[in-house]
Amino acid sequence: MKNYNQVYVENSLEAAQHYCRAFGAEITRAFLNADGTAYEHCELSVNGEGFLALAEAKNPCDVALVHRMKWETMTFNVFEMGSEEAVRHAFGVLSEGGMVLQPPGPLPWNPFNATVIDKYGVCWWIAK
């Protein structure tokens, strides 16, 4: 059995590239809508392993409201990233246009981590 998450976002073509840049991922499967302007389904992999799926949201959320309210209804946890530099890199990309909830640093349960709601309204906890 395998499990990974899927996000529904506005601007799915841009979001896929954004997440590839943040995590060193690559698009391994992609199905565009009829006019080629959005993903009906897209899968990202890191080192050959499925990491994240995404698709264009049919009813996108108000990301500005998510940022203003600092909503954390669900968090995607990416951990064992291998180094503080990997966490800093992902944090730098994910925080572009996003809302930082916790900057990179230690917590009692992890020596180096951060939490950010990205510009698509997705909350990420990233850790070494």
Predicted features, each with a name:
Residues 1-10, 17-117, 126-128:
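Vicinal oxygen chelate
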